[in-house]
Amino acid sequence: HIAGGSSVYEIINQYSALNTDENSNMPARDRRFDVTLLINGLPMIHIELKNKQHSYMDGFRQIKKYIGEGKFTGIFSAVQMFVISNGVNTKYFSAASDTELNEKFVSGWLDQENNPVSDYIDFAKSVLSIPQAHEMIARYTVLDKDAKRLILLRPYQIHAIEAVREASKNGKSGFIWHTTGSGKTLTSYKTTRNLLMDIPSIDKAIFLIDRKDLDTQTTMAFQAYANNDLIDVCLLYTSPSPRD
């Protein structure tokens, strides 16, 4: 039960994506997808597989080409997450246009002890089983309105948020330790958002900022994330310096 209801999960493979662009100057070319995971009838996670003699990045380049050819349109425009693997190396990244897909956003999976999960079977068990696959889409994606892009959280962010959620359910407190450039603002937003959505007894969350220069930056980021979400972000108070 994700997002308050029952869901139906399906897997399709070798789907034929036909060429439908009549205005294209390129020769008509049909494509065959490897594996697609459907949630409630909608394709949400697409997987491209290569053999061990090829780089997993061949899958990235193939997906980018398919997007440029218009193959991920119609119902396949619902795809949120791509997975690429050559069996021994497996990565994931969020959906985007072909011009915006960037190799730097390709991420591997890590377990809770920070050990890499590279084998495609182990990755499937950790990330693509149910309910994990649905949670990746429902809990750990963010649509950034200002940047106009979909963001998939990285493993360390997801594990931290899950730890906070489990602690909160048991009436405990805690903190998330992050370094500069690790996505602290995004992690803070998703931690707050998931607590509000998952635990009925939590009605409101207060986010404290101890540096004035981060005030506007954080507020704008939270509002950009929340614009297409189910929570509201309000700027309530700006406290004077304790010395005042």
Where are these regions (language model features)?
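Conserved small/polar residues in nucleotide/adenosyl-binding loops
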Residues: Y237-D244
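ATP-dependent helicase/translocase motor core
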Residues: H1-I209, D213-D229
